[in-house]
Amino acid sequence: MMRTRHWIAAVFAVASIAAALVELGAANRGFAAQTMQIDGTPITIYRPNAGGAPPVVVVAHGFAGSQQLMQPFAATFVRNGYIAVTFDFAGHGRNRMALGGSLVEIDGATQALVDETARVADRARDFGDGRLAVLGHSMASDIVVRFAQSSPGVSATIAVSMFAPSVTATSPRNLLVVAGDWEGGLKQEALRAVGLASAPQTAEPSTTYGRFDDGTARRAAFSPFSEHVGVLYNLASQREALAWLDGAFGTLRAPGSGGVPDARGPWILLLLFGSVLLGWPLSCWLPVADVAPSGVKRPWRRLWLPLLLPAIATPLLLRLAPTHFLPILVGDYLAVHFFVYGALTALCLASLPLPWTKTRPVLLSAGAMVVYGFVAIVWPLDTFVTSFVPSGLRVALVGVMLVGTLAYFVADEWLARGTPGAYFVSKLAFVLSLAIAVALDFERLFFLIIIVPVILLFFIVYGLFGLWAYRRTGSPFAGAIANAVAFAWAIAVTFPLLAG
């Protein structure tokens, strides 16, 4: 049962969760949010409580993102007098339409997304006074740039973490490029794009070139201590974007007032921290399956084969295997990679005794962990970060992914929980295995790079959940089942759905 340290952790976790929820609730007050659909595309309209018909800003998310991810910019704009419109691209978030067209051809998926942006923007103009600006992150930076270049009525374009080869010295109008200070390559891209207009001067960050009134304004801005996702929550990013809109639309603010940015980022981290921490004391209530913790308790010299052979053999075996059988980008490959990796691990461990464990306590513990994961991880992510609840076809995809992830985690937890340090090494080996797969087929599996941060985060969070469950139940299999469900869920809801 719970000891003093568990009670202290529980109190601290609950206090953190409560404080975060209060602040996050306040972050969504002061404006009205309305959801609707435009030709099947889910959108959210953020309107100032003051009413009126101000300019409209269409805000577009990046690859494998969703409109929830763009809430910091939307909230910043609406609190400062603009109407913001966010939406889910086809194949993303809660948009049930699959993304069509080639991912590598400009006239394929790129043009389809530009056309979808145009449909949303055409309708969004009617929500305000007719003036329009656009903001796009990562993949969507290229999309909004191309849309603005084909739509002379767009007053300003804000490209966050931009890569947009179609940018010229004069098009699109009034271009702001924002990058995180830790995005080295994208910082250079920002300066290159602005340098097209500043020439013969060398483009410098935080310097505005040209004029808003004739559409020639150009600026590159770098947000401190930010990477590819953190740049969205950085207050400097939001201030730069708001100031750019004010300049483009001629909005005047009181002296000394730079507008009110959205500070939800730290509170989201506090909420997730409290939710993870609370899992430790709650694990004390899980039923005991084995009196003595089970697992592969062997010296390291006998673990290197099951640790390294699957990591090397899996990407080699799958190099030429047909793994494109699901309508979700690289999700089918990941499912097969998990399955083959787990099967090879199990074969390597076949000479070792399978730990005996009671089935009922394991299933009860696994069920409790899965439910807690929905409450502590899925709900906060879906509400405050990005779309994380499956809909339509994605529900079935969770089940398909589970076949692969369950094979991997049952074998891996059996291997890794008995020997100190084995868990870290086994997860490192799996990530390196994915790196080998990408290196062997970069064009086909490039998008796996995007999910590696998510995999690492889930390895840490659910690794802790699994460790606490293992120490309490004595069985590695409760954590294995919970990990398998979590990873199957994350893969099925993260990657875009593809047509054909």
PLM region descriptions:
Residues 2-10, 475:
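N-terminal membrane topogenic signal
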Residues 19-24, 276, 280-281, 314-318:
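Alpha-helical transmembrane segments of multi-pass membrane proteins
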Residues 10-14, 268, 272-279, 302, ...:
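Hydrophobic alpha-helical membrane-embedded or membrane-associated segments
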Residues 251-303:
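Cytosolic-side membrane-insertion boundary helix
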Residues 7-21:
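Hydrophobic membrane-insertion alpha-helices, especially the h-region
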Residues 26-28, 286-289, 470-478:
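Membrane-interface capping segments at transmembrane-helix boundaries
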Residues 305-500:
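Alpha-helical transmembrane segments of integral membrane proteins
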